[in-house]
């Protein structure tokens, strides 16, 4: 027994000094990214746009210096915003935590902080045009897009369409009908994301509350966008593709191929104005 006790008292080789990770400065980290042009690939925006966004959110994302005095120090607001943007771009939480040497648990907390800051910022909120001044401003953008010589789309304020956003198929405990999320058109599982944007790719209405099997017309209705569009004062309207029903406030293309000259011309300019929603989706999903 004494021998056994003595064995427990034998100390192992002395442990080395604890290595403390240092947190890299934001400006130091992004310098090579700016120089080689990969900053936008990483954060989905130019450095100047990042600074502008950070200036809007600074009071909400900057760290508490008193709470960050120990261990690796406080996480600077730029790192919080950067991690949030990387996560929103589809990167895993490990990639979001990589730069500032954050533990994954810390990274989750900082991404949540960044998301809350974005959602609480009034200047970033999706806003539907209501006043005459706002409507005229939106219409001016589409007049500019419609033609260099003759502004055909004089009173258009938006263009709408649907996008399938891929998700992991829910189980029966999460949704009573998991198969409803399968889109036969796209052959994948997702949610139907309805969006209306202006001529400058700014989203003015968005909703993602219907399963992927829902057609665009029904998803548009369940989002409440049909009532929203119909509430537009005359003569303003929105553009949509053939999946939506035609009304005085929702202009869709003429169906079929055997169209007369006037109908064909209308479809051309209607399609020209509707390009902005496709480009908006492209901006959303590109990396």
Task: Label every PLM stretch briefly.
Residues 1-69, 123:
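Charged, often Cys/His-bearing segments associated with DNA-binding zinc-finger transcription factors
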Residues 34, 75-78:
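Alpha-helix N-cap/N′ positions at the starts of helices
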Residues 46-49, 53, 71, 79, ...:
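Generic hydrophobic, aliphatic-rich segments that mediate packing or membrane embedding
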Residues 47, 77-79, 187-191:
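Short, flexible loop/turn motifs enriched in small residues
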Residues 59-75, 86, 105:
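Charged, surface-exposed interaction regions in soluble eukaryotic proteins
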């Amino acid at each position: 027994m004494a021998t056994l006790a003595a064995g427990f008292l034998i100390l192992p080789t002395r442990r080395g000094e604890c290595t403390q990770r240092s947190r890299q400065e934001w400006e130091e980290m992004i310098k090579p990214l700016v120089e080689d042009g990969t900053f936008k690939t990483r954060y989905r925006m130019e450095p100047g746009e990042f600074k502008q966004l950070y200036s809007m959110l600074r009071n909400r994302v900057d760290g508490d210096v008193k709470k960050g005095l120990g261990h690796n120090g406080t996480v600077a607001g730029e790192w919080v915003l950067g991690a949030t943007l990387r996560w929103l771009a589809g990167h895993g939480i490990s990639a979001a935590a990589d730069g500032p040497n954050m533990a994954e648990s810390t990274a989750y907390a900082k991404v949540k902080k960044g998301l809350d800051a974005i959602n609480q910022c009034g200047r970033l909120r999706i806003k539907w045009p209501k006043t005459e001044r706002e409507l005229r401003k939106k219409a001016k953008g589409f007049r500019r897009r419609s033609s260099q010589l003759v502004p055909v789309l004089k009173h258009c304020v938006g263009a709408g369409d649907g996008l399938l956003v891929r998700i992991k198929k829910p189980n029966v405990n999460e949704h009573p009908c998991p198969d409803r999320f399968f889109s036969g058109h796209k052959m994948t599982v997702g949610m139907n994301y309805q969006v209306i944007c202006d001529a400058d790719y700014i989203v003015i209405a968005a909703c993602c509350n219907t399963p992927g099997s829902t057609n665009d017309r029904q998803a548009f209705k369940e989002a409440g966008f049909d009532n929203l569009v119909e509430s537009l004062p005359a003569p303003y309207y929105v553009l949509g593709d053939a999946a939506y029903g035609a009304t005085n406030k929702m202009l869709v293309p003429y169906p079929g191929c055997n169209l007369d000259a006037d109908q064909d011309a209308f479809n051309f300019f209607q399609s020209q104005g509707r390009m902005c929603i496709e480009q908006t989706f492209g901006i959303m999903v590109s990396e």
